[in-house]
Amino acid sequence: MEIGLVHYRVGETDGVSLEMVKWKQALRNMHLKTYLIAGDMGTSPGFKIPYIAYTDKRSNILKQKSFVNLDEWDENYFKKEMNKYIEDIYNQLYEMMDLDVMIVNNIFSLAHNPAAAVAIYRFCKDNGIKMIGHHHDFYWERDFYKNPTNDYIKEILEEYFPPKDITHVVINSLAQEELKNKKGLDSIVIPNVFDFNQKRWEIDDYNIKIYDKLNISQKDLIFLQATRIVRRKAIELAIDTVAEVKKDLKKYIGKTTFNGKKITQDTNVFLVLPGLSEESDYVEVLKEYASQKDVELKLAFSISDDIRHEEEEIFSLWDFYAIADFITYPSILEGFGNQFLEAIFAKTPVLMFEYPVYKKDIAPLGFEVVSLGSKAEYERGMYRVNQNEIIKAKEEIFQILFDPQGLHRLSRRILNLGKNIFPMKLWRKS
């Protein structure tokens, strides 16, 4: 049996790309031939379909015409352009003809590229390829997609997002309920999983160079924000919390952290962001806000990738986890939470906002985190939580930083929970 995993991109550090690699490995462990298919392959081997890349010009034009404004186009012209794009994508799929199964990641659910959804569905139908829709996010969850501009795009959303006659997989129980309520479709829940048996992420002779690359002392404290840089990640909440930590750090001069860093007059605190920067205006907002709050941001995407490239001094995302003292994960909305699983494996304490899926599917399992609560307001382009939550989180962070035995017990218990609840072998049971 030959299986294709398709998405707009792979070989990056975003959640869908990372999860596709896990599925590929799990399927190959079951002795199934498995291939990655994407518009942009990043560092991964596989089949490239350029027309479905996030950066494709026609994709972005039609996305704007579909959900923002038709402008000078009328509906007939829109339909003509959309159909031509569908045909072009269809024709690029010819190398996939021998597949038995196509696992379609987010293309049938998020509506970033409606033409890709139609083309892939028709191609699979025409060639007898079974389809599994792996839905990480739904278009109705995002404000951008809530106002289609014409009847043709409404028809496409109704028929192909997602198609009714395929197998559906979602990554949390809230998504399962929504898909049933909105579309009348049943689905299987397979949460994000993780290979807890892989080699530990530890500081070594290579990743220790990150300190010099970012002009950080090995004695400084590093808070790691490992997500992409987009608004729903609410990185401003990490800035708020780090600002409070930095403000009170001098009270702890002379103390030693759980990982052996002695706090001195010169100890600094950094918020390091190695993730993809996908909203340039938001990056500027964060820079300005961090400056106001006296927090030093280190944007590290230029030296980060999904795997190491030692000849170019590029580090993997896991290298950044190895040097982190604390993980920040204040996302307002997540399909599941890859960074949460990564923090568990890294045995690094995590600060997080309790987004809906975390509250529903993860928190009841017994994980312990430093919480920013579950209520946030969006005002003037940024998310806010009650200042009392920030102060409470700061106090818990200091308690963890200077209690090595307590952290050891906590991280060991949480790691064991993670191994038992979200292992790669969960795949075989689903």
Curated annotation (Swiss-Prot):
Cofactor(s) this protein cannot do without: a divalent metal cation
Keywords: Glycosyltransferase, Transferase
SUPFAM superfamilies the record matches: UDP-Glycosyltransferase/glycogen phosphorylase
The reaction(s) this protein catalyses: (2R)-2-O-(alpha-D-glucopyranosyl)-glycerate + GDP-alpha-D-mannose = (2R)-2-O-[alpha-D-mannopyranosyl-(1->2)-alpha-D-glucopyranosyl]-glycerate + GDP + H(+)
This enzyme's EC code(s): 2.4.1.-
MF-aspect GO terms: glycosyltransferase activity
Gene Ontology biological process terms, A to Z: lipopolysaccharide biosynthetic process
Gene3D superfamilies given in the database record: Glycogen Phosphorylase B
Record-linked Pfam families: Glycos_transf_1 (PF00534)
Family: Belongs to the glycosyltransferase group 1 family.
Biological function: Involved in the biosynthesis of the compatible solute mannosylglucosylglycerate through a nonphosphorylating pathway. Catalyzes the synthesis of mannosylglucosylglycerate (MGG) from glucosylglycerate (GG) and GDP-mannose.
Protein name: Mannosylglucosylglycerate synthase
Gene (UniProt): mggS
